[in-house]
């Protein structure tokens, strides 16, 4: 003790204090250095994530594009990411991140499914048929067949290309970009091989719809009674997540731990290729799984014989007493700032504020990238891991959207084609190829034609989720859309639709649409009589939580069925589709983008052709727009090549459309109700596209065709649907109703091309409400529509005008009191000005030239379009009496009578028509053509 004390005497005491102080200083310095490194790492993490946001989370060229997959046949669907059962399973797998990582380290079986492996080279869907991939043929399933879920189903739900910020690489047709050789892995008997994969998705209302969740369960030998979870992936569609400090630490730690175990874990997985666009992972990989089937005990869990409990929200019965309301007060007006792009294809790069419910979007700038919050168990973004030996539920991170910036950011249109199981590359009609009916089946095909007025036999042979070629113009994939696009309700109305055609329509929407944008799919059954569209359809669609069926208790027709769907829709945008369509890749976002930029825009896809005879998918010519000819017959008209060249119009440019086809379009729900929806006085079908088109354009809206949105449609020469009344009379009645409300003075032009419409005296119902609605909306005139929207439509108000000259005498018809006389021609005299109208009246103001057949003379009478005693044939008589083309003929008498001039007496009279009599030939000063 004395020896120690001497060190603290005198100078030794000073040295001791200096030593102690040095040690303490060193400790503080090391602590400060550690804190500094932590701050630097956090800063680098923030910069890296912000940089990725600015660069759009681009997929590098060496990263993967994937093989599309699908089911074949029409059996009950597998319980995929859209399935109800798997939607619920995510809630049962909750465990903290630390526990998950400890199990990874303990078992030594961890693998980063999206880790750093060599990527498969890019390839294109159009070249699938050239790839040497062997997939076992599947037996065509009927509506009541037992579904067989293959083992590869677990991953194939997400074998899709999510090109959020990467231009798709496309080679010339027929030239594959790469060869993908299929192989089958075999498991070691000592190794625990995965037997079953079940895909499930989180349906929590708080979960972000901007992302996609996939939970993969690996079930081992039943004797061991172990359920193992491989991974849970969160595919990001837009902005990066907010990573918390503890989460970042655990992720990086797990990556390091799994790096050495990757090779061993890979042996347990057979062949399968997929990709996910992970914002915080720099590399992507392929995972491999074996093609096979579920064991019988697992397959039985999804057998169609299982009793299904249909919720009240799945099937809604609408009775006759439930009146279809169209009160605009039901949907509040959207108080938003409307911006009209200056150019037709205006740049969508500006942020347009929108006061409506939006899909959640991750903020691009991370103000709290390193937070102290603990990780939570919810559908979030994390690295994909696999634990093949222990029951380890997946984990994620709850994103906070409290501080969403004003500019939500943009991304490239997603190229999504999600399917439930691998596609049979050799299936009939795959990739939109034509199919030929075998000779021995031609009679059966002919007999079934009447079921849908197209080749129903071939439709049933073709997979309900077949692949079709991406027919979008080059450059569409490079276009940007906003991250916070509005949600949409898909409304499909049908009556006695062909089973396979209806299923193919629904599958194409589910497979090729970003799920976070689909609020629901409403199938409105307009009182179908087919048995398979009742319980069988309910059973099939119950597999998809977002599909609801509305059943009308009596036949209402397409128009009122759509109104029923609109009333039950909850999405921000209504997207109407026919029930025999196939949506192509990238079809939805371009439509919603236009509505997002301007809520008064009605966006229509390019409607391509599904051949009714061989079911082939065919593209159409570019630069087409919807138009009409008199009397309001819809048709397609191509923009002339010289106009395209002169104005430098590109294939991707948006086209203003005077009239939409009416079957396929997206419209803001609140705006739809502001316009008064469809005219509820229209019956069944026909004319509704004209009515809504005129209403949109004349009341402040716009209709556009979006070339980057493509939807195939089965065009039929006739439809098989029954009408409560005569079909033609129903359509004509609707058109007359539209003309009386919207055409103003031009309705005579409409009647002139269908003069029988006046003669029939159709009861169009009460028009007061529709006319008052037009005044309330302060809609423009039809002349404005012709001048500004459809200027190339020839629409003269009258057929001929000016002075009426007798070709033999050179004298003109004139008015004197209430009589008609012949005078010297004076073009400046108002008494000699006449109009020959489209309803064949010779008008002078409110007076019309009227014959008195019994006396053989003429007089003036108040004009009445319905009075056949005032109608004359001129020029148009050439169809029946070509020799009387220059005569003015009165045909509503026992014999043909013609107007004849007598200059000596300055009178006009009626005489029997004589083609050789020059005094019976007349001409107006000016004629108009259409």
Swiss-Prot record:
Look up the record and report any one GO term of the cellular component aspect: Golgi membrane
Which UniProt keywords are present, listed alphabetically? Disulfide bond, Glycoprotein, Glycosyltransferase, Golgi apparatus, Lectin, Manganese, Membrane, Metal-binding, Phosphoprotein, Signal-anchor, Transferase, Transmembrane, Transmembrane helix
**Catalyses which reaction?**
L-seryl-[protein] + UDP-N-acetyl-alpha-D-galactosamine = a 3-O-[N-acetyl-alpha-D-galactosaminyl]-L-seryl-[protein] + UDP + H(+); L-threonyl-[protein] + UDP-N-acetyl-alpha-D-galactosamine = a 3-O-[N-acetyl-alpha-D-galactosaminyl]-L-threonyl-[protein] + UDP + H(+)
Q: Where does this one sit in the cell?
A: Golgi apparatus membrane
- Which ranges does the record list as Lumenal topological domains? 36-930
Q: Which residues bind substrate?
A: 526, 555, 579, 685, 716, 721
Q: Where is this region: Catalytic subdomain B?
A: 654-716
Cystine links in this protein are 476-708, 699-779, 812-825, 848-863, 898-913
Q: Which loops or segments lie on the Cytoplasmic side of the membrane, by the record?
A: 1-12
Q: Which SMART domains match?
A: RICIN
For the region Disordered, what residue ranges are annotated? 190-209, 327-381
Residues with attached carbohydrate = 198, 213, 283, 287, 309, 355, 387, 568, 766, 817, 835, 902
What does the entry state regarding organ or tissue expression?
Answer: Expressed at low level. Not expressed before E7.5 during embryogenesis. Expressed in dental mesenchyme and tongue. Accumulates in a subset of mesenchymal cells at the ventral-most portions of the 12.5 dpc maxilla and mandible underlying the dental lamina.
Q: Which family does it belong to?
A: Belongs to the glycosyltransferase 2 family. GalNAc-T subfamily.
What is recorded about the domains? Answer: There are two conserved domains in the glycosyltransferase region: the N-terminal domain (domain A, also called GT1 motif), which is probably involved in manganese coordination and substrate binding and the C-terminal domain (domain B, also called Gal/GalNAc-T motif), which is probably involved in catalytic reaction and UDP-Gal binding.
Q: What is this protein called?
A: Polypeptide N-acetylgalactosaminyltransferase 5
What organism is recorded for this protein?
Mus musculus (Mouse)
Q: What is the lineage of its organism?
A: Eukaryota, Metazoa, Chordata, Craniata, Vertebrata
